[in-house]
Amino acid sequence: TTIILLIAFAAIQLSKADDLKFVFVMARGGDFVAGDYAGGPKIINKEAKDSELTEQGKQEAFQLGTKLSELYKTKLGVSKWDSKTTYWPVALSQKRTQVSTLITGAGLEGDQSKRNKAWTNEELKATSFPAMESFSRFIKPNECPKYLEELMKQKQEISTILKECSSSVQQVKSKYSAVNVNLPQHIWLAYETLKKLKRQQPSSSTWMTDDLMKNLRECSAKITWLATTKTDTLRKLSGGLLLNDLFNDMDQITQGKAQPNAPGGKDSKLNVFTVSQFLVISQLAAFMPEGSKLNNKAVTASDIYPEDGSHVDIEMYQENNKWSVKLVYVSGKDKQPQTITLPGCQEKCPYEQFKSALQKYKITDEEHQKACKN
């Protein structure tokens, strides 16, 4: 009996050896019915903002929850996933994104019956939190002209990127005349729309060859990474608010308090935030200053581009009263997890060092509103 007890005790100690205390997950929402993105070219003549999740999108969201449970349930010491106590699903205010985060929660709980559930307005509304709407401010020219102004200073480099895929873009334009070959956002958003069409309407998408899509993806990756990382101002305006909100929450957790607004208070161990692709990119930009590594290699735009099923996990550890942070990135549903390391940090970065490395990108909502206009 003593030996059995010792073995059980050793197993408990091993499972708690890394002392994982909390995980923030930012995930790209699941696949949805193809539509035209705001700011992009008219390809389908139906707005993407009204599109609902496809069956594949629901499956992706559920599988993410299942995967997160396998990864973190034991490590976090959670006996049962429950959105009122042990985890908090949040999302941007688009209905499909809210549905996506709730289905990810169903995946955590292992509840298949919720995959096709008709969610009530109350359930959808419960996925929002106060700071959320400000995160998208930077991409709205009327609310943040400074971001566009800063981006336009990079015109020369943007032109170089556009030349790299000009023949592919011309091919797309021959099919969809609304594509403006000189607008970088048209290239990226056209690629994202075409990718959905290729998957959802394969018979009418045979002209979209693998080489064409690969070339458009490469350009989209370079455009979006440049647009969020080329200068400190771009990093700050695109991802600084997210960073500020996360640091506020992380500060509370390192002081032994609950994540603010989490329904479960101190019992809450996991926060799932489902967002649009551009916010995953801007979060990565704010979390990866110059010199950061992805699996100990230099970062390329192509490696970082978030596909369907992508998510960033911020793991918070406490060892001997000292807190550290580990960043894990999965760039798509079939991709392996990669560790992000900041300059001067090991895989796990002491919390104060982590904060100090990113401090210059952090910005409050009030400061952000001013910086957007000045």
UniProtKB/Swiss-Prot annotation:
Residues 1-17 form the signal peptide. Gene3D superfamilies: Phosphoglycerate mutase-like (3.40.50.1240). The keyword Oxidoreductase does not apply. Disulfide bonds join C144-C372, C165-C219, C345-C349. Keywords: Disulfide bond, Secreted, Signal. It comes from the Eukaryota. Its main location: secreted. The keyword Signal applies. InterPro entries: His_Pase_clade-2, His_PPase_superfam, Histidine_acid_phosphatase. GO terms for cellular component: extracellular region. Serotonin binds at V25, D245, D249, N271, Q283. Transmembrane segments: none annotated. GO terms for molecular function: phosphatase activity. It is found in: Secreted. Lipids and biogenic amines bind independently through different binding pockets. Probably modulates blood feeding of fleas on vertebrate species by binding and sequestering different mediators involved in the host response. Binds biogenic amines: serotonin, adrenaline and noradrenaline. Binds leukotriene C4. Does not bind histamine, leukotriene B4, leukotriene D4, leukotriene E4, ADP, and stable analogs of thromboxane A2: U-46619 and cTXA2. Belongs to the histidine acid phosphatase family. This is Acid phosphatase-like protein XcAP-1. The lineage of its organism: Eukaryota, Metazoa, Ecdysozoa, Arthropoda, Hexapoda.
